[in-house]
C-alpha cells in the first residue's frame, strides 16, 4: 500500500517542482526585461509530443518576433531545454478529462496556451503576454503556470481531481 502512495507523492513533487521552475524562469525573464529595458521571453517549440523552451531577447526595440529570431535580429539566450530533462516524467499537456484553469473542457491536450507564435514575452514596463502553460506528471499530477498580461504576475495552480477544481499553490 505504501509504494503506490509514495510513487504518487513523488510524481506530484516532480510536477510541482517543474511548475515552480517554469514560474521562476518566467519571473527571471520579466526581471531581465525591466532591468535591461528590452523585451525578454521564452519561446516554446513543439518537438514530438512535447515542447522545448528557449530564453530569447529583443534585438532591435520592436519586441520579440519569431521571424526576427529565425533571421538573427532577435537573440536566442539559451540552448533549447525540455522540462522533462530536469524533472523526470513531466511534460507540457493535459491529462484526459482535466478542464483548463477557467473550468472549461480543455478541448485539446496541448499544454502551451500562449498564442500561435508560442512566445511568452515580458516587456520593459513589466507587462507580459498572457497565457497558461499546463504541466502533467507521469501519474495524475496536473499543474498550470499562468501569466497575467497587465501585471506580469505569475501564478502556479494545482488541479485537484477529487474536487475537479484548480487551486493556487
Q: Where are the language model's segments positioned?
A:
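N-terminal helix-rich module
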Residues: 1-24, 31, 39, 44-169
